[in-house]
Amino acid sequence: MAQKRLTHLRQLEAESIHIIREVAAEFSNPVMLYSIGKDSSVMLHLARKAFYPGTLPFPLLHVDTGWKFREMYEFRDRTAKAYGCELLVHKNPEGVAMGINPFVHGSAKHTDIMKTEGLKQALNKYGFDAAFGGARRDEEKSRAKERIYSFRDRFHRWDPKNQRPELWHNYNGQINKGESIRVFPLSNWTEQDIWQYIWLENIDIVPLYLAAERPVLERDGMLMMIDDNRIDLQPGEVIKKRMVRFRTLGCWPLTGAVESNAQTLPEIIEEMLVSTTSERQGRVIDRDQAGSMELKKRQGYF
């Protein structure tokens, strides 16, 4: 693919780097949330470009639920070590003590306690006043209307009716003590942009994004990859090897795989060109209307 056909990627890159530098200059204690997925990998790559040849002026934070894919944990530790990043890992101790898990307590309670509450705990613990996230507007309708600088009150809540105007590339980062800003440098990127940029820049990603034979079972209309032995099979369920990959990554019991033969980045890009479904179709946490993304954000979710 010729360089001249990818000029829009360079424009997106420049915008994201500008946002990252603005936050680093404006806030006293920023952090970059690192969820280990493709968007996090692109955001980290952009941050490293923004401050090259220096090191990142802020740490990475992973809010761990204890249920990520094993390959994600391996990739997280390897990446942080390779790039010399300060990596903070937080797991909600109350949730761990209660034994919260997606099979017993369901996706809504698991997400609220281990992700939303865990994130708020970590932000309070370290006193971060700005947190980068890899969310994009094309992912989901509540994210589509959220600003690049997303204001949060002292309880980390988002009010969609209380958003600040963003004229051109001017962002309002004024906050009072206890308040914070969630920052989304990839807001204007699409899933296709992400994959083209990963290919263009040769960015390392978790192998789960590439198709391979993996052990899966069908449950609730989802192809669940069995990553460890913390699952009880229901009557009639059979684990089979199938060619699958993931378009989005999260906790393995709550993230559905898609059947695919795309084993290279060009094949993924080609597959995305004809896809008619959302990348979040496999996320169980998005299926419950009562637990919609906007409601989660109002409660403090990213």
From Swiss-Prot:
Enzyme class label: transferase
Keyword Transferase: yes
Pathway: Sulfur metabolism; hydrogen sulfide biosynthesis; sulfite from sulfate: step 1/3
Keyword set includes ATP-binding: yes
GO molecular function: ATP binding; sulfate adenylyltransferase (ATP) activity
GO-annotated biological processes: hydrogen sulfide biosynthetic process; sulfate assimilation
Catalytic activity: sulfate + ATP + H(+) = adenosine 5'-phosphosulfate + diphosphate
UniProt superkingdom: Bacteria
Keywords for this protein: ATP-binding, Nucleotide-binding, Nucleotidyltransferase, Transferase
InterPro entries from the UniProt entry: PAPS_reduct_dom, Rossmann-like_a/b/a_fold, SO4_adenylTrfase_ssu, Sulfate_adenylyltrnsfr_sub2
Pfam families, per the entry: PAPS_reduct
EC identifiers of the protein: 2.7.7.4
Signal sequence interval, chain numbering: none
Quaternary context: Heterodimer composed of CysD, the smaller subunit, and CysN.
Listed NCBIfam families: CysD (TIGR02039), PRK05253.1 (NF003587), PRK12563.1 (NF009214)
UniProt record similarity statement: Belongs to the PAPS reductase family. CysD subfamily.
Function: With CysN forms the ATP sulfurylase (ATPS) that catalyzes the adenylation of sulfate producing adenosine 5'-phosphosulfate (APS) and diphosphate, the first enzymatic step in sulfur assimilation pathway. APS synthesis involves the formation of a high-energy phosphoric-sulfuric acid anhydride bond driven by GTP hydrolysis by CysN coupled to ATP hydrolysis by CysD.
Stated name of the protein: Sulfate adenylyltransferase subunit 2
Source organism per UniProt: Shigella flexneri
